[in-house]
Amino acid sequence: MAGAAPVYCVCRQPYDVSRFMIECDICKDWFHSSCVKVEEHQAADIDLYHCPNCEVLHGPSQLKKRRNWHRHDYTEPDDGTKPVQAGTRTFIQQLQARSFPSADDLLLKMNGSQLTQRYLEKQGFNLPIMVPRLDDLGLRLPPPTFSVMDVERYVGGEKIIDVIDVARQADSKMKLKNFVKYFMNPDRPKVLNVISLEFSDTKMADLVKVPDISKKLSWVENYWPDDSFFTKPFVQKYCLMGVQDSYTDFHIDFGGTSVWYHVLWGEKVFYLIKPSDENLALYESWSSSVTQSEEFFGDKVDKCYKCVVKQGHTLFVPTGWIHAVLTSQDCMAFGGNFLHNLNIGMQLRCYEMEKRLKTPDLFKFPFFEAICWFVAKNLLETLKELKEDGFHPPNYLKHGVKALISALKSWMKKESVAEHAFEIPDNIRPGHLIKELSKVIRSVEEEGNRPVKSQGIHGHCPVSRSSHEKSSHHSGRKARRLRDHSTKTPTNLDILEHHTREVLKRLEMSPWEEDAGTYKLNMRFNKPLLPSSTEPDQKVRDNGIRLLLSNGRIIRDERQPFTDRSLYTADSEDEDDRARSRKAKDIKQEKPCSTSGMEDKAETQKPLNMFFESVKSELRNGSSEYSDISDSEGSEDNCTNQKHFSEESESSGDDDDEEEEEEEERQEPIRNLKEEHSGRRLPCDPNFPWPDHDSPQKRECPTSTSMEQEAVQGMLSMASLHYPSALPTPAKSTDCNIRGGYPQLHIRVSQGNGKEHLDSHSHKAANSDHHVKDEGEFSALDWIRQPDASCRLSPQDSCQVPQSLRREFAHEEYEKAPEDKHYLEIEHWDSAEYQPEKYDPESSMSSGECHLSDGSLSPTRIYGDTAAAVPLHPTKRPASNPPPISNQATKGKRPKKGMATAKQRLGKILKLNRNGHARFFV
């Protein structure tokens, strides 16, 4: 049939490149060696081959005649003109007769327990190591009675193995069963040696466990990914079977690998040469010479050491050592090769030498360049981790990474990238990896003087470790990076980014509505300070947080276990620890925008039931925002000019047990009203921030009568808020904070000599990057019962508020609010000057001043909603002041259903407490 492939041999099969064939000198047909029972190594000895068909007519094949014992081609005439070649019988005899310096002075002899990763990292792996016993080495082997026939049983007789014809120093292939037959025959026509039987994929692999040290250091064990496109290199388990006089000439193990040998039975002799620069240069020159086999390389160097490895001994040969091996008696040995981090530079140097010498792929480390890319990727991570942990990498690793970078760069050059592109893993970006690795090693070299962290101190090595350790180590590192990032405390930048998004979301909300039902009320009421003549300033700062509420839910009560931690932000626990220790440094000042066209004071009167309505609306619909940064980016009408001085201040401390008991007693009269709102109380945080959509005006605080205090008590009871205890002495002072998502008003009133003094101090604003300070002078018996106009301003009107208002009065009067109306009226105001200025801790505590400042970050605070203004209890503003904005929506409204009951309770409380202690509350 036309186009059909030609067929050969007695089997009439087409040509197969993987099968050895021999040509018949008579019929010129080709035959498979396995079909005609001719081994590959035997074909070299045949002078004329006759196939089975031709053999009948022309007789058997004719063998070559031996004419010498010192040349690879034994048919050459022995005229004494040609030198002895390596591996021949003459060469072996001469080698055994020579004397060499003993390696005893060179070798490091130690026990298995001493050969540790930490030792090699500290001392280096530069000299051969001899371990005379298996104890503590981690090496498991078959018993010394294990024979070549056992190897055949475990591996399989049909396995094709590489065999070296020692006399010719040529390799060939044969079946394992044929080699075993040869080995067991005492009459051996030639010397054959097996040195490359890798059995990791056979049953015999279970009988052998490699030394712990080689497994811990091995690149393949540590860095080769299981899902790699490339076939994983198996070079750790070799069985070496050699008959007497087997010889392997001088060589460096492929890829510059280190190697371990253990002689199970028999004996081997190693001829060792140091890998100095001079010796390596000589070796490369010798290897490329056409007369290589005629020159004994040991004669070219200064010293060649002889090391005898006896039965039961284990020898470790470091990277780059040039060595030859003679089998002085029949021997079976096990060994393995491994790349590692201790000598990266030398490994790369040996690999480049192999390429220059054009070493066949069969004798090179499988996928050497691919594993270098994997190692580079992992070492980049390792260096970053060492730097993150505050350790300087050891010198051997630093030098190795630099050598690796140089090699990777050379492989990526335009003129050679095509040659190396095949071994670049798909999941690696070579250019980016080289750049990042160069950057990290450069930064490591610049840092310099840090303690060196051994990679084997704690039983595992982040740079080189066993497969079990690798998986656990990488999983731990991965959890730490994603670290570990699920449990890691957020950084300031993380918090900033998160809350910037929150601010932007709030800025997209619709403008403020003038309906009181849309306002949010968030308030904090401090307990009265204990009288102290020596620590007034400290007491003011140490007012504790009593309650935190978000979305109408109590999330912290110091008298009850805190259970709902889910409402914390990611960094709130960290802030708990940090906020208590912070001290006030500066505050941010804010200039209020001017306003005009304020209406008459009569138009600002707001029925008390509207205040209750707004409170209920807050409890029903309000939500507290979790924010750590300022959301003071106002609308385009906001004319506030801000300056940042500091973001830190001391947060409030905890109150003592006595104050807690007093608080319990104070809460009894209003506990039933709190139950009306399902036990929900507004947050009592001394440091809760107010938003800065509009600059709030100063609140002026005239004194209160007993009736007004009782009315406020009932009013606050309606809002499910705590009521502070009475002031038992005229000198006692108390603090009260009003917060509703606005800069906090922290007021301290001291009663004495018929006068009241207001004081405030500034706290850190955790969700605001600025502080506001207002100062004003108050005359005696001034008290506020009218809402701040600026808190009722629309964004359009907020810019018209005057920057400075100051009014002084000689007398102030009070009007009692009718009980059926449930609101309070005040005819006169004491207007203090509102002037931003630098914060002064001392002046802030002096009497006659009222400061507006942002709330500080308290350890358990939850941040309040900053999207709407705060509705305040009804008051009056004097006609001399610019009239406040009129809110028509609040005039003439009837109380909502259910408010009558609340008013009845309020009236009852007012009657019960009519003759009680003088109390006040804001």
Curated annotation (Swiss-Prot):
Cofactor list: Fe(2+)
Location of the region described as Disordered in the Swiss-Prot/TrEMBL record: 445-490, 565-607, 622-711, 754-773, 872-902
Main subcellular location: nucleus
Location of the JmjC domain: 199-355
Keyword line: Chromatin regulator, Dioxygenase, Iron, Metal-binding, Neurogenesis, Nucleus, Oxidoreductase, Transcription, Transcription regulation, Zinc, Zinc-finger
Keyword Ribosomal protein: no
Span of zinc fingers (PHD-type): 6-57
Biased amino acid composition, Basic residues: 473-483
GO molecular function, one term: histone H3K27me2/H3K27me3 demethylase activity
Record's cofactor remark: Binds 1 Fe(2+) ion per subunit.
EC number of this enzyme: 1.14.11.-
Pfam family, one: JHD
Entry-linked SMART domains: JmjC, PHD
Compositional bias ranges of the Basic and acidic residues kind: 667-683, 691-701
Any one cellular-component term (Gene Ontology): nucleus
Entry-linked CDD domains: PHD_KDM7
Residues annotated to bind Fe cation: 251, 253, 323
Entry similarity comment: Belongs to the JHDM1 histone demethylase family. JHDM1D subfamily.
Function: Histone demethylase required for brain development. Specifically demethylates dimethylated 'Lys-9' and 'Lys-27' (H3K9me2 and H3K27me2, respectively) of histone H3 and monomethylated histone H4 'Lys-20' residue (H4K20Me1), thereby playing a central role in histone code.
Entry domain remark: The PHD-type zinc finger mediates the binding to H3K4me3. Binding to H3K4me3 prevents its access to H3K9me2.
Name of this protein: Lysine-specific demethylase 7A
